[in-house]
């Protein structure tokens, strides 16, 4: 079925009359490929790059390894047809003459120099002939639907029309992306995006807010009021009543004229215009007290009462210690000595009155007066009441 490369018939001249030094056989018998540098000559041998030129006449020669007496071969690496020394028996052989152009060209040239009549119909050159880099298995019974004209009209023309229509479609998509609501706009407020589009009685589109307002109240939704002007933009305003330009709040009277805060409040409370004699150059502001002042008062009152209680106890103790003298008779002139019972009664009276006054007497102290007295047998701090005072 398959013929070896060595059994291929030699027809004398090689099928490809180009540089014969590209494919060399070494002494061992293995071929060595040497790439060619002549690119234009390679491009000229490609049949699908030829615009309207007829096929080369030497393409009709039978393919094969045309080996000469030497070890060189005439195979060119730039040839589009692979070398073939065998043929497929089921492929039909062409009966066309060798010099006729315009027939169907296949990748394998079968027989003694004849061309294959039918090839692959999907790859078409410019001059009307068909060529393919793959073996041709198409039988002569080619269906008419695979003709070149129908293929171009059904596939290529549809692709061209799609490419021509792409710019128009892109512009439409960009327009819809800029306006996500399919280009809708609320006829009342002019909104272009809303969670839900509604319609009024006339069929116009309304946004969700305007549609609900119109449905509930029966009237169109009022537009948002304009933002109030800043204080810098109101610098030219003047009170209609007192002609002042300085106020914390601008008001309007019954006629809609701007008035200052003082004149507006006076008119609202008394029903008559504010007298000009009450006009003041400076604005009197209210001194607001902090809101947590009551909590501060209760906390300070509790702390003062808590601090006063131990101080009163210490004062009462101090009165007892100052007024206590355990002697009944006065041994020194100018010094009054009070008994313990009298001192306790006086201290109770002082506590009841709430006041205690200590009035020292003027008398000279001598070193002998500071010495311990012989009449005192018991120290003063050893009494029972003194221990309570010092506790």
Swiss-Prot record:
Residues 66-76, 317-348 have a biased composition (Polar residues). PROSITE patterns: GATA_ZN_FINGER_1 (PS00344), GATA_ZN_FINGER_2 (PS50114). Residues 53-100, 281-378 are annotated as: Disordered. Pfam families: GATA, GATA-N. GO terms for cellular component: nucleus. A zinc finger (GATA-type) spans 186-210, 239-263. Residues 295-316 have a biased composition (Low complexity). It is found in: Nucleus. InterPro entries: GATA_N, TF_GATA_4/5/6, Transcription_factor_GATA, Znf_GATA, Znf_NHR/GATA. Its main location: nucleus. Residues 285-294 have a biased composition (Basic residues). One of its GO terms (biological process) is positive regulation of transcription by RNA polymerase II. More abundant in stomach and small intestine, lower levels in heart, lung and spleen. Very low levels in liver and ovary. Probably involved in bone morphogenetic protein (BMP)-mediated cardiac-specific gene expression. Binds to BMP response element (BMPRE) DNA sequences within cardiac activating regions. PANTHER family: TRANSCRIPTION FACTOR GATA FAMILY MEMBER (PTHR10071), TRANSCRIPTION FACTOR GATA-5 (PTHR10071:SF289). This is Transcription factor GATA-5.
């Amino acid at each position: 079925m398959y013929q070896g490369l060595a059994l291929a018939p030699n027809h004398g001249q090689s099928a490809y009359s180009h540089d014969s030094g590209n494919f060399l056989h070494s002494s061992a018998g293995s071929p060595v490929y040497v790439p060619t540098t002549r690119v234009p000559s390679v491009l000229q041998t490609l049949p699908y790059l030829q615009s309207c030129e007829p096929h080369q006449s030497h393409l009709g020669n039978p393919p094969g390894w045309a080996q000469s007496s030497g070890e060189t071969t005439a195979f060119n690496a730039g040839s589009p047809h692979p070398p073939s020394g065998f043929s497929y028996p089921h492929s039909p052989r062409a009966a066309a003459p060798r010099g006729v152009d315009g027939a169907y060209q296949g990748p394998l040239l079968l027989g003694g120099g004849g061309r294959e009549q039918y090839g692959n119909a999907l790859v078409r050159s410019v001059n009307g002939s068909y060529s393919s880099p793959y073996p041709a298995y198409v039988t002569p019974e080619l269906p008419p639907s695979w003709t070149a004209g129908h293929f171009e009209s059904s596939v290529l023309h549809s692709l061209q029309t799609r490419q021509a229509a792409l710019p128009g479609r892109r512009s439409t998509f960009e327009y819809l992306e800029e306006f996500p609501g399919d280009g809708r706009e609320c006829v009342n407020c002019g909104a272009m995006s809303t969670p839900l589009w509604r319609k009024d009685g006339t069929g116009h589109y309304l946004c969700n807010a305007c549609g609900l307002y119109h449905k509930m109240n029966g009237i169109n939704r009022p537009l948002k009021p304009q933002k109030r002007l800043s204080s810098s933009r109101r610098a030219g305003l003047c009170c209609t009543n007192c002609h002042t330009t300085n106020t914390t709040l601008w008001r309007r009277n019954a006629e809609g004229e701007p008035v200052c805060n003082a004149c507006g409040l006076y008119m609202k409370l008394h029903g008559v215009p504010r007298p000009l004699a009450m006009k003041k150059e400076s604005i009197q502001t209210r001194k607001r007290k902090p809101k947590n002042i009551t909590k501060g008062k209760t906390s300070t009152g509790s702390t003062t009462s808590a601090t006063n209680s131990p101080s009163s106890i210490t004062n009462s103790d101090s009165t007892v210690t100052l007024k206590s003298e355990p002697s009944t008779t006065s041994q020194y002139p100018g010094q009054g000595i009070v008994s313990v019972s009298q001192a306790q009664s006086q201290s109770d009276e002082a506590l009841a009155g709430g006041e205690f006054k200590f009035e020292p007497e003027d008398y000279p102290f001598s070193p002998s007066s500071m010495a311990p007295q012989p009449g005192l047998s018991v120290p003063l701090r050893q009494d029972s009441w003194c221990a309570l005072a010092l506790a």
